[in-house]
Amino acid sequence: MSTMDELIRVAKPLGESIHIGEGPQISIRNPKGLSDNIEAVVRTAVFGENRSKGLAQWLIRKLAVESGAFPASIHHFYRARGRGETPDDFTVPAMNLRALPFHAARAVFRSAVSTDACAFIFEIARSEMGYTDQRPAEYAAAILGAAIAEGYSGPVFIQGDHFQVSASRYGKDPETELDAIRSLMKESVHAGFFNIDIDTSTLVDLSKKTIPAQQETNYTLCADLATDARKLEPEGVTISLGGEIGEVGGENSTEPELRAFMDGFNREFGSRLPDAPGLSKISIQTGTSHGGIVLPDGSIAKVSVDFDTLQHLSKVAKEYQMGGAVQHGASTLPENMFSHFAESNALEVHLATGFQNILYDHLPGDMLEEIYAYLDAKHSDERKEGQTDEQFYYKTRKRALGPFKQQFWELPSEKLGEIESAWEDQFQLLFGSLNVGGTRQIVERFIKPSGLDVKLSAYLGADAGEEDVSDLAD
């Protein structure tokens, strides 16, 4: 069967709503018919065999761009904020949609349309790609397919979160570990991830006597990887790059640490690519832990976020032409705390576990029992001494997202609708608290379509291999 015939077969659920011409060239004839039927193509992009999967992923991206929803970098918008050319009274939510990303993203886009929001990011971490069984092109297809389904137009910011160097693997074989990050960046950029958070903060060495010495390996390797990322840029795209100075859950970051990192990074990066833009943001630590601290009864301990530190370091970051500071691991905070991020002028906040919790809160009891039995059988080695069942299941249940991916998709439509509705309520709350409603006009002032044409051949290569990501942050 020719590639053209294969593509037509993959596109069959869309019927007469699109036209596929020689090239292949794609055009939309019936936008509503496309929106109503795109889910079937997304299913192929997620669960299809290799070639069908790649064809579906390419087709979705082409149709999204044709519909006006295009993968974009947030770089110029963040740099403008650093220059004081935009308000800084809102915080951009970066949302890790670990499970049912098509359904979750539909809820995000509905919330965005109803609030006229445009400053929001979809992301997935290196670790999450492993345990959720989602490579970059699959994740991007789910997000862009959701944009089509909801009739959303405008920039779609898709981000590689925590492209993190494993300290243990780096210690054994530095170049192999760095090559794994380089390979992942290449795969991600090909898929439309034009925002990448490089995380070499795992290599900060607190045994060194001075702060610049502690940060040296961090900023040097971040500069190396940022250089590699800049060399991957498609024509017309400036990738938004972030760095990180403090591992989530550790001590609060300080101004001397930020300055040591940025001075070192700018010196190292400038020696490699003198005329290229550097980082657009910096991730810091102000008190949270990824996924929250789990108490014996399974509830989440109250944590404090040092919003004064967040505000101060965002201000310092702007001196380095960045948009501000980024907070990780915040989705399990009490709802009344989210407005403080915007009030503190935080640039971006990363949210993940809270959305996963909503999914688990709505799963049927028999499926939950099956998941817990799976965790007992496959991940009992992760149970810590003295840990209750509630603590063990809460901390490990993310490991079930990949193995149960298809079962989540096959939940009854009423149950899926219930989960989507709960997610939408949460996204609406977050968009309001973070003050991103009404940001479309200001974002579109700085973010324009790149005009990038994506070749089908880029989606028909071999699948990326699996890797051990058990020691990486989410």
What is the role of each PLM region?
Residues R169, V294-P296, P334-S344, L359-E370:
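Histidine/acidic-residue-rich catalytic or RNA/ligand-binding cores of hydrolases
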Residues F90-V92, A317-G324:
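Short, surface-exposed connector motifs at secondary-structure boundaries
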Residues M1-G160, S166-E177, S183-L184, F193, ...:
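Alpha/beta catalytic barrel-like cores
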Residues G192, G278, H340-V349:
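Glycine-enriched alpha-helix->loop->beta-strand junction motifs that scaffold or abut catalytic
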Residues Q159-F163, G324-L333:
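Glycine-rich beta-to-alpha transition loops that act as phosphate-gripper elements at the mouths
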Residues D199-D205, S344-L363:
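Glycine-rich phosphate-binding active-site loops on the catalytic face of alpha/beta enzymes
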Residues R106-A119, A137-A141, G145-E150, K172-Y320:
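Alpha/beta enzyme core
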Residues D161, L241, I282, H328, ...:
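Conserved, mostly hydrophobic/aromatic
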